[in-house]
Amino acid sequence: MLEEFKKFALRGNVVDLAVGVIIGAAFGAIVNSLVQDVIMPIIGAITGGLDFSNYYIPLSSKVQAGMPYAEAKKVGAVIGYGQFLTLAVNFTIIAFVLFMVIRAMNGLKSKEEAKPKPEAEVPADVKLLAEIRDLLAARREA
């Protein structure tokens, strides 16, 4: 059973998947930082200093106007559309980057498929047999 698991775990697909998950998690953290630390502050500056992470709609009378989103969530039910907007921007960036990576990979793959493959060299014994066949065929016709 241990040997079977070892074969499974060391197969190329499993290792490739593990590497992909690790790189994906790291990439997600980078995109998250890009959105929260770069893009959203720029959008906030353009819109007059708005902090989208604190935008919400209170669904409870216990939530007072102007409370930070984290406190409002603790006090009562709220719809955090500012947080949703931030996550939607995250998703859009990740989806676009993945699209570009897959597009580039497909382009490389199609270039590789388009290259003419060199014909295999015919072995000497096969050439000799073909010559003998041709000579015998010519002798029969004569």
Curated annotation (Swiss-Prot):
Membrane-topology descriptor: Multi-pass membrane protein
Localization terms from the record: Cell inner membrane
PANTHER family: LARGE-CONDUCTANCE MECHANOSENSITIVE CHANNEL, MECHANOSENSITIVE CHANNEL MSCL
Keyword Chloroplast appears in the UniProt entry: no
Gene Ontology CC terms: plasma membrane
Protein name, entry field: Large-conductance mechanosensitive channel
Reported function: Channel that opens in response to stretch forces in the membrane lipid bilayer. May participate in the regulation of osmotic pressure changes within the cell.
GO molecular function, one term: mechanosensitive monoatomic ion channel activity
Principal subcellular localisation of the protein: membrane
InterPro entries, per database record: Mechanosensitive_channel_CS, MS_channel, MSC/AndL, MscL_channel
SUPFAM superfamilies for the chain: Gated mechanosensitive channel
Complex and partners: Homopentamer.
Keyword Methyltransferase: no
Domain of life: Bacteria
Family: Belongs to the MscL family.
Transmembrane regions listed in the UniProt entry: 14-34, 38-58, 82-102
Keyword tags: Cell inner membrane, Cell membrane, Ion channel, Ion transport, Membrane, Transmembrane, Transmembrane helix, Transport
A Pfam family reported for this protein in Swiss-Prot or TrEMBL: MscL
